C-alpha cells in the first residue's frame, strides 16, 4: 500500500503541472483568458507556498533537551501562598504545593484566575502577600514568558544564540528542530511573526541547560502541526516542567502527570476531561 503522503505528493504535482500549463497557454490571450491565467497563477502560488511549508516541517529533526545537572528532589516548594493585586480581591489563599523532580505539572483554571501570576511569583517578579516560595539551591530555571523578554528584538535569530557555544552548522541543525531553515536565522526578531518569536524563545530555553522549566502558554500563536512538534521535543525532557496551558492536544502529548486547579488549589492526577472543560470554557469567554 502506498503511503498517504506519497499519494498527496503525486496529486499535488499533477495539479501544479496543470496550473502551469493553463497559465502558459492563456497568459497572452484575450482579456478573459488573461484573467483566467491570473486566477490560476494565484492558485499556483498558494499551492507552492503550502508545499514549501510542508517540506519545511518534514525536515524537522528532533533535538534532545539536555540539563546541566539534576536538581534536588523538590526543586520548587510553595507554602501557604496568598496573593491578590489588592487585599480585598485575593486570587488565592494558603496555596501549597511541591514540584517533584522530573515531573510534568500543569496549572489550569479560568482566564484571569492567576495562572501567569503564579509563575511570576515563583520567578520573584511579584511578591506574595503571605507565605513563601522555596527554590532549592540546585534548581536552574528556564522561564518562557508570553512577553518573550529573553529575546533581543534588535538582533537576528542567529545573534540571539551567540553565547550558545554551537558552531554555525550545529546551530542551524538545532534551530531546524524548531522549524527554522536556511536563511531564517538571519531574520531580525522584530520582523518575525508572533509564532516565529514563540519558537525562538522556546529554542532559547531548550538550549539553556535548565533543569526546571516554567512555560506560560507556550502554544499561543503556533499552528496545530507546530504544537505537536514542540510537544514532541519537550516530552522527553528529563527535568521538571511547570506548564500553564489549556491546549488539550499539546498537554496530552507532553505527558502531564499532575495538575493544579486554580483558584481552589486542588491537586489531582492528570485528567484530560478537566483540561477540555477549561479549554472550552476559556474559548467561550474569549468570544464574548
Functional labels for PLM-detected ranges:
Residues 1-61, 166, 260-288:
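Extended, highly charged alpha-helical segments
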Residues 1-5, 64, 68-288:
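ABC ATP-binding cassette signature C-motif
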Amino acid at each position: 500500500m502506498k503511503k498517504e503522503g506519497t499519494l498527496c505528493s503525486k496529486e499535488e504535482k499533477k495539479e501544479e503541472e496543470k496550473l502551469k500549463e493553463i497559465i502558459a497557454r492563456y497568459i497572452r490571450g484575450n482579456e478573459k483568458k488573461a484573467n483566467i491565467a491570473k486566477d490560476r497563477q494565484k492558485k499556483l502560488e498558494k499551492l507552492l507556498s503550502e508545499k514549501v511549508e510542508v517540506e519545511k516541517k518534514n525536515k524537522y529533526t528532533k533535538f534532545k533537551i539536555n540539563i546541566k545537572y539534576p536538581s534536588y528532589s523538590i526543586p520548587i516548594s510553595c507554602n501557604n501562598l496568598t496573593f491578590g493585586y489588592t487585599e480585598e480581591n485575593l486570587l488565592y489563599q494558603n496555596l501549597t504545593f511541591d514540584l517533584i523532580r522530573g515531573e510534568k505539572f500543569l496549572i489550569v483554571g479560568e482566564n484571569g484566575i492567576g495562572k501567569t501570576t503564579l509563575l511570576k511569583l515563583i520567578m520573584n517578579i511579584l511578591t506574595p502577600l503571605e507565605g513563601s516560595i522555596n527554590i532549592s539551591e540546585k534548581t536552574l530555571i528556564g522561564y518562557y514568558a508570553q512577553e518573550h523578554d529573553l529575546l533581543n528584538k534588535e538582533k537576528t535569530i542567529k545573534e540571539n544564540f551567540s553565547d550558545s557555544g554551537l558552531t554555525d552548522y550545529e546551530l542551524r541543525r538545532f534551530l531546524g528542530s524548531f522549524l527554522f531553515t536556511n536563511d531564517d536565522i538571519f531574520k531580525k526578531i522584530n520582523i518575525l511573526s508572533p509564532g516565529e518569536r514563540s519558537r525562538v524563545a522556546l529554542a532559547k530555553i531548550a538550549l539553556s541547560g535548565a533543569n526546571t522549566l516554567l512555560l506560560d502558554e507556550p502554544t499561543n500563536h503556533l499552528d496545530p502541526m507546530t504544537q505537536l512538534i514542540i510537544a514532541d521535543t519537550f516530552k522527553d525532557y528529563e527535568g521538571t516542567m511547570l506548564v500553564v496551558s489549556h491546549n488539550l492536544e499539546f498537554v496530552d502529548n507532553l505527558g502531564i502527570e499532575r495538575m493544579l486547579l486554580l483558584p481552589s488549589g486542588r491537586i489531582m492526577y492528570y485528567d484530560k476531561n478537566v483540561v477540555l472543560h477549561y479549554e472550552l470554557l476559556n474559548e467561550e469567554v474569549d468570544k464574548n
